[in-house]
A protein has these predicted regions:
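Active-site catalytic-loop/activation-segment of kinase and kinase-like phosphoryl-transfer enzymes
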Residues: 166-223
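Active-site activation/catalytic loop segments of kinase-like enzymes and analogous catalytic loops
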Residues: 264-307, 322-342
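Helical subdomain adjoining the active site within ATP-dependent kinase catalytic cores
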Residues: 187, 305-393
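Conserved kinase catalytic-core helix
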Residues: 94-102, 129-175, 216-227
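Catalytic activation segment of kinase domains across protein kinase-like and atypical kinase folds
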Residues: 241-273
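Conserved NTP-binding catalytic cores of kinases and kinase-like/nucleotidyltransferase enzymes
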Residues: 1-117, 227-228, 246-248, 374-393
Length: 393
């Protein structure tokens, strides 16, 4: 699989820059797509290749069949306008138009080419929001306020939906928090999937405990997820590592996943990944407290933006999506084969190592979700800080 992806990327890069001396770097960490850096003259680019729109981990597990069948299907897949990276190309162009229209501080990578399933875009510079939250000097509240302001402007852009509906760019419902949770934890194959999590990493009793925790989350979260309205277009993959900050104050957002969704999903994924970042990176106590306070301020502002009693409903929706994203992320890590050949994100590996504690915290928060969502958020925030400092929950 990886040899096929590498050969395809090299072929497309050479066709895009014939006669140029091109340097192609090693594979970059990702469980979703084949990623690599490309240098041409003095410029840097990123090449991305998707196999059947399915995560590389799923392909390696045989979820789409043996490799010869996958390779044959891939030849047809890359010609489809609904292919994942064909949609991403359209999304990047629509986001660039949004940035020009709003004259805000958002930038996105420039599309250079899309050929044979390979998307080439400009490489982006700047420090990541993840790094700034953990090690930076800027107040976390300011950082997160700036990010959410850009997201809000995106949600309110009534022209964006029209631009995207003219193509297949919004046809990405399978990447949403709700769709991912439904695919992983419900349906005919869910039981086998849950039973397989942790294979090669954990003993039988620990795996049974994990499956029980995931099942408990499914029973609470799935009925609530099914009732969520999806009235706006959201960025869809707003993670701390996908936001790059420039000294001038502008931000570059990479790896979009534009989709119709509840606006709470945007903040839910951002907060979910920040909590995992704190737990796995363990910044200084002062910085950790500042980030925790900034997250709490965001949630308070989010609730205050809804009239009573709608604020309680909005908070419940936010936390349902938050906990579902936690479950999705941990399940991905626990599904990694022990002999996997992929370079994996360090945070995924670190979070997987603490999966039992994280799932225990998620189940505790979920238990009070229906009755008292404010208490559930307090449980999440306090538990995050406890795990990040190595204290028992």
């Amino acid at each position: 699989m990886l040899d096929h992806a590498a050969r395809t990327v090299i072929m497309v890069v050479q066709q895009e820059w014939p006669g140029e001396v091109v340097s192609i770097g090693p594979q970059l960490p990702s469980v979703t797509n084949y990623l690599t850096a490309v240098k041409v003259r003095e410029g840097w680019f990123v090449a991305k290749y998707s196999i059947l729109g399915t995560s590389l981990l799923s392909i390696l597990r045989g979820a789409r069949g043996p490799w010869d069948r996958v390779e044959a299907a891939q030849r047809d897949y890359i010609q489809q306008p609904t292919a994942q990276l064909a949609r991403e190309r359209s999304q990047l162009r629509a986001l660039a138009a949004h940035a020009r229209r709003t004259e805000g501080s958002l930038r996105v990578p420039t599309v250079i080419a899309y050929q044979d399933g390979v998307l080439i875009s400009t490489a982006s510079s700047g420090s990541s929001l993840a790094g700034e939250l953990v090690r930076g000097r800027t107040a976390p509240a300011r950082l997160l306020t700036d990010v959410t302001a850009i997201a809000t402007a995106l949600h309110r852009d009534r022209f964006l939906t029209g631009e995207l509906s003219d193509s297949y760019a919004l046809a990405m419902p399978h990447t949403s928090i709700v769709a991912t949770f439904t695919r992983k934890f419900t349906g005919a194959e869910a039981s086998c999937y849950l039973d397989s999590l942790g294979t090669g990493w954990l003993g039988g009793s620990a795996r049974t405990q994990l499956a029980t925790s995931f099942q408990a989350l499914r029973e609470i979260l799935h009925p609530l997820l099914r009732r969520l309205p999806a009235p706006v277009v959201i960025y869809g993959d707003l993670k701390p590592e996908h936001v790059l900050l420039e000294a001038c104050g502008r931000q570059t957002w990479i790896d979009p996943g534009l989709q119709p969704a509840n606006p709470a999903a945007e903040l839910a994924k951002l907060l979910s990944r920040i909590t995992l970042l704190l737990i796995t990176s363990r910044p200084s106590l002062v910085r950790m407290d500042a980030v925790g306070a900034a997250m709490d301020l965001l949630v308070t502002s989010f609730v205050a933006g809804h009239p009573r009693p709608d604020g309680i409903t909005a908070l419940r929706r936010l936390l349902v999506l938050f906990l579902a994203d936690w479950a999705n992320y941990l399940a991905s890590g626990l599904s990694v084969p022990p002999d996997v050949v992929l370079p994996l994100p360090p945070m995924l590996l670190a979070a997987t190592g603490q999966a039992q504690s994280l799932l225990g915290l998620a189940c505790e928060a979920a238990a009070s979700l229906t009755i008292d969502p404010a208490r559930a958020w307090g449980t999440v925030l306090a538990g995050t800080l406890d795990l990040a400092t190595g204290q028992p929950g």
